[in-house]
């Protein structure tokens, strides 16, 4: 039900403001969202503010029992969602048939049997949506929207490190009067709440964004029940800078490595720069990197804290590995200490040169504000080197020559290649990775196909009874 006065926008703003105004660890504990009701869990866990390194709110530590309750609510709601008036369903069926005809140029009426064939897309059922911590609202919404449009009901499992955003979003669904049980959310750790969602026999589909290690386990577990799976996993994204690149693009190239502290799966972490401009480029790039302001994200800064202490230690470890492997650290590379946030997890943009392609910092996903720059000579050489890792999520190419751009893009093994730009997203285009970076594609048509099952219906109009 909507709020009594219909003024849900003001109520929604008040919920957010209360979160902002509450001192660390003094806000009331958060709750799961099951069948349009905010339900207290069996137990809570601390959510840590990475800017200060201190707990700031308690969130549910979701159990298998709570996941089961959310799935049961979604399963029950699916019966109602499927109960569409016959006239509306007929309209959908023949609209699909017309769309199929227009897109394939095939006649519907077969001369021999006078049959009409059309394709109907049915919702799959209960969808399990497991989203990561780095872009918590965007990446959850990117899954939620097509899943709901296709007619599914959902159980969301946001990262336990950034569950507050999803909790606020659930308030929006409740305030606007979304049908009971269509959208549900369970917070908690992946090894408990997430694992139960993957294993549940009434969850027919899993959409996951996260690490390659966890994604491969989800794929293995889901295969036992033949569930549909979409996996958007890790990356070690290359950027290729040709000697004739536009120098005005240097700021965008740096941004492609350090936006959101480098905690975006699409960030550039390996830069291949053509030899004639290598030294000049590194100098200009370091100057750009040093312009990024590191600080508490409540102020006007470009680089905030690493998401967690564990992740912060991981990034620091890779920087130490780079030093031990003979890498040259041009900037960053050390903990940044901030007044009032001495225990926060801050690392300044770090630029490294002098590492071979086989080094860990050139092959492993670091997922932080760390980039390795290395020279190359020819297009053939750099394409082979860029494709040499086990990942294939995205890449960037920078050149003033259109043929050079397109020839390189065509040879790169990546789900998305940006030419003279970065993160320019057209949401109708397929999105996903190659190799160890993912399975499946999402985005408009691809999402609707993933979140639905295609059914072919053949009707013999010539039959007489």
Tell me what each language-model feature is.
Residues 53, 91, 151, 183, ...:
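Residue-level signal for inorganic ion chemistry
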Residues 65-68, 72, 82-103, 115:
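Long amphipathic alpha-helix in the N-terminal Rossmann-like dinucleotide-binding domain
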Residues 50, 64-67, 246-250, 278, ...:
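Residues at or immediately preceding the N-termini of alpha-helices
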Residues 103-248, 300, 376:
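Rossmann-like NAD(P) dinucleotide-binding subdomain of oxidoreductase/dehydrogenase enzymes
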Residues 2-3, 51-57, 203, 240, ...:
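Conserved C-terminal structural/oligomerization subdomain of aldehyde/semialdehyde dehydrogenase
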Residues 130, 189, 209, 256, ...:
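Conserved residues at the C-terminal ends of beta-strands
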Residues 2-82:
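Short, structured beta/alpha segment
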Residues 213-356, 419:
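ALDH superfamily catalytic-core signature
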């Amino acid at each position: 039900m909507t709020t009594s006065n219909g003024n849900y926008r003001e109520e929604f703003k008040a919920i957010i403001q209360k979160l902002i105004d509450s001192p660390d660890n003094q806000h009331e504990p958060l709750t799961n969202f099951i069948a349009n009701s905010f339900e207290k869990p069996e137990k809570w866990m601390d959510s840590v503010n990475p800017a200060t390194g201190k707990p700031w709110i308690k969130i549910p530590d979701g159990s298998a029992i709570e996941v089961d309750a959310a799935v049961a609510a979604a399963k029950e709601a699916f019966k109602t969602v499927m109960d569409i008036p016959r006239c509306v369903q007929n309209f959908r069926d023949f609209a699909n048939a017309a769309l199929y005809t227009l897109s394939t140029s095939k006649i519907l009426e077969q001369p021999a049997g006078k049959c009409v064939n059309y394709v109907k897309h049915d919702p799959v059922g209960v969808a399990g949506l497991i989203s990561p911590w780095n872009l918590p609202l965007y990446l959850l919404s990117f899954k939620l929207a097509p899943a709901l449009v296709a007619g599914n009901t959902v159980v969301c499992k946001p990262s336990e490190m950034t569950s507050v955003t999803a909790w606020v979003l659930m308030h929006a669904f409740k305030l606007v009067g979304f049908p009971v049980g269509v959208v549900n959310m369970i917070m908690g750790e992946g090894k408990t709440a997430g694992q139960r969602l993957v294993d549940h026999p009434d969850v027919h589909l899993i959409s996951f964004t996260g690490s390659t290690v966890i994604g491969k386990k989800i794929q293995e577990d889901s295969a036992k029940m033949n569930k549909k799976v979409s996996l958007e996993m890790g990356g070690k994204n290359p950027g290729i800078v040709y000697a004739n690149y536009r120098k005005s693009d240097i700021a965008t190239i740096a941004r492609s490595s350090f936006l959101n502290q480098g905690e975006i799966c699409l960030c550039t972490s390996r830069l291949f720069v053509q030899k004639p401009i290598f030294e000049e480029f590194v100098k200009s790039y370091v100057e750009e990197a040093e312009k990024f302001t590191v600080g508490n994200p409540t102020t006007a800064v470009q680089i905030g804290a690493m998401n967690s202490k564990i992740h912060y230690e991981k990034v620091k470890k890779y920087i130490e590995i780079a030093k031990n492997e003979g890498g040259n650290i041009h900037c960053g590379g050390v903990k940044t200490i901030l007044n009032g946030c001495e225990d926060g997890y801050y690392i300044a943009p770090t630029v490294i040169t002098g590492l071979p392609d086989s080094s860990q910092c050139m092959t492993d996903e670091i997922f932080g504000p760390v980039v390795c720059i290395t020279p190359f000579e020819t297009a053939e050489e750099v394409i082979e080197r860029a494709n040499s890792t086990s990942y294939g999520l995205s890449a960037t190419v920078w050149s003033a020559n259109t043929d050079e751009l397109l020839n390189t893009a065509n040879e790169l093994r990546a789900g998305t290649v940006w030419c003279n730009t970065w993160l320019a997203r057209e949401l109708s285009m397929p999105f996903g990775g190659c190799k160890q970076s993912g399975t499946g594609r999402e985005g408009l048509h691809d999402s609707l196909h993933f979140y639905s099952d295609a059914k072919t219906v053949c009707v013999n109009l010539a039959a007489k009874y």
